[in-house]
Amino acid sequence: MKKAALLNSDISSVIARLGHTDSLVIGDAGLPIPETTTRIDLALTHNVPTFLQVVNVVTSEMQVEAAILAEEMIEKNPAVHDALLDQLKRLEQHQGNSIALHYVSHEEFKTQSGKSRAIIRSGECSPYANVILCAGVTF
């Protein structure tokens, strides 16, 4: 049995196969997922697991150099937005690098998310609780 925080074999496999600048999406329960994109569905019920719980566990194993968010999140979901920024700041300190933040419209976010290696669906039921994490390198 794995000893690290991330036990989900599908997510572990996707992270292990990421190359520099490849992306992985963590989304809320309502984010549309194209048929052509790998879906990893973790949603059990409303808010289980939460978006932030999934971000925390995924980033414990993924090297992140950039994050893309929908600009609507700032106004429509400020509590989750601020908590996500706090998590990314802690991740920067842990990784020893800067994580670039990019904001796009929700429509552009949905377009870009379809180009990711996978979309992880959380049980989060708050608006715009989505992030595209772009893989960095550990050297």
Curated annotation (Swiss-Prot):
Transmembrane segments: none annotated. Signal peptide: none annotated. Pathway: Carbohydrate metabolism; D-ribose degradation; D-ribose 5-phosphate from beta-D-ribopyranose: step 1/2. It is found in: Cytoplasm. The active site is at H20 (proton donor). Substrate binds at D28, H106, Y128, A129, N130. SUPFAM superfamilies: RbsD-like. Gene3D superfamilies: RbsD-like domain. One of its GO terms (biological process) is D-ribose catabolic process. One of its GO terms (molecular function) is intramolecular lyase activity. It catalyses: beta-D-ribopyranose = beta-D-ribofuranose. Its EC number is 5.4.99.62. Pfam families: RbsD_FucU. Keywords: Carbohydrate metabolism, Cytoplasm, Isomerase. GO terms for cellular component: cytosol. Homodecamer. Belongs to the RbsD / FucU family. RbsD subfamily. Catalyzes the interconversion of beta-pyran and beta-furan forms of D-ribose. This is D-ribose pyranase. It comes from Pectobacterium atrosepticum (strain SCRI 1043 / ATCC BAA-672). The lineage of its organism: Bacteria, Pseudomonadati, Pseudomonadota, Gammaproteobacteria, Enterobacterales. The gene is rbsD.
